[in-house]
Amino acid sequence: MEGFQKKRAQIVPLAYGRVLEIGIGSGLNFDFYNFDIVDEVVGVDPAVSSVAIAESRSSKYDSKISFIEETAESIALDSETFDCVVIGYTLCTIPEPLLALAEVNRLLKPHGSLFFMEHGLAPEESVQKWQHRLAPGWKKIAGGCNLNRNIEELILTGGFEFKDLKKKYIKGPKILSFQYYGEAVKAPQH
C-alpha cells in the first residue's frame, strides 16, 4: 500500500547513530535511512527467507547493515548499545509484543529513541468490531498480522513515553489503515 511507504519515508530518516531495526524483513526501509547520520543498522528478524532477500538488498550500503536471525522477544546483544530502534509494521506480527518492547527498552541507550510506524486498532467502535471479527482469519492468511492491536497502549505498557505520536487513517480499508507513528523514549524509572 502506498500509504505505508509514505510513513516509512517520514519516520525512517529520523534514525541516527547505531540503529536496531526490529523485523527488518526483506529490507524495505533501507532506501529511507540517512547514512550521513546512521553509523550502522543491525536488523533482527526470525524469517530466514526474508533476511536472505535483505542481505542481497543491503550490498549497496558498504557493510553498514548486518543481520541477526532471532525473534524480537529475546535478542542476544548487550544492553544499552543502540542510539535508536526502528519498528515498522512489525508489532502486529510479533507473538509477544510486550516482551519485544522490553527488549527494545533494554537495548536502547538511556536517551535513545524508538521510531515506529504501525497499523492497528481503529478508534471507532464500529471498525473495531470488524477488526476483532476478522482478526483470527486475517492472522492465518497474513503472516501472523493482528489487525486489532492497540499500538499506543502496547508502547506505553512496554515502558515508553511518547515524544511524538500521530494517529490517523491512510488510504485503504479502515480495518487495515489506521496508523500509529512517531517517536517514543524510555519512561523514567520510579
Language-model features and meaning:
Residues L98-P110:
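A short glycine-rich, Lys/Arg-flanked "PGG" loop and its adjoining helix->strand segment in the class I
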Residues H111-H119:
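Conserved beta-strand signature within the Rossmann-like core of class I S-adenosyl-L-methionine
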